[in-house]
Amino acid sequence: MSPKTRLDSDFFGPGDRWQTVAGVDEVGRGCLFGPVVTAAVILPETAIAPLQQAGVTDSKRLSQRQRQQLYPLICEVALATGWGLASVAEIERWNILQATFLAMRRAIAKLDRPISRCLIDGNQQVPQLTYPQTTVIQGDRHCITIAAASILAKVWRDRLIERLDERYPGYALGRHKGYGTAQHRQAILQLGPTPLHRIRFLRSLRQPSQQIDLF
């Protein structure tokens, strides 16, 4: 974490303890392909300093190798972990924001411990959540539990997309993990979308000069 890191406990309410507070984050909101994935994690206070020393921070600031090294460490020391997924069909039906909230609720529901509060990355509260919650802007940079959740979500989703790369060759999914790189966009224009591409997102690819009708 950075020198400006705030302790998660800065966001605790009365009665909250480390062992009852869950950090929650998502990955894949801006992708053209695949589900949005979320993770929730509860850490013991004794794990905070070791995880900070190990380099746990926002997953986007870490290399793939660093994330893969930290993933088993987080799982080992965590009191509880949970993952949630919202499918492409759910993203298409509800929109990406509501699908992300759905995935977050699913991840939190898989935590097998009492929960007194959820620390949510971002500035929007999760609707229909039955626990008290606090949103933290750039929480994955400031809160160790949210940072840990960001790593768990990122590694889990990356592994899923790498498996799907074998099912849908030609799109280089294993390289860009479904994000809208130039290579990915060009592959879609050449090959057309797969069943796991987000049609709402792909509409932005349509240009008058393109001779290929994707839809």
UniProtKB/Swiss-Prot annotation:
Pfam families for the chain: RNase_HII
Biological role: Endonuclease that specifically degrades the RNA of RNA-DNA hybrids.
Example of a GO MF term: RNA binding
CC cofactor note: Manganese or magnesium. Binds 1 divalent metal ion per monomer in the absence of substrate. May bind a second metal ion after substrate binding.
Organism expressing this protein natively: Synechococcus elongatus (strain ATCC 33912 / PCC 7942 / FACHB-805)
Lineage, opening ranks: Bacteria, Bacillati, Cyanobacteriota, Cyanophyceae, Synechococcales
Keyword annotations from UniProtKB, A to Z: Cytoplasm, Endonuclease, Hydrolase, Manganese, Metal-binding, Nuclease
Cellular component annotations (GO), alphabetically ordered: cytoplasm; ribonuclease H2 complex
Cofactor entry: Mn(2+); Mg(2+)
Protein name from the UniProt record: Ribonuclease HII
One GO BP: mismatch repair
Residue span, RNase H type-2 domain: 19-213
Family per record: Belongs to the RNase HII family.
Positions contributing to a divalent metal cation binding: D25, E26, D121
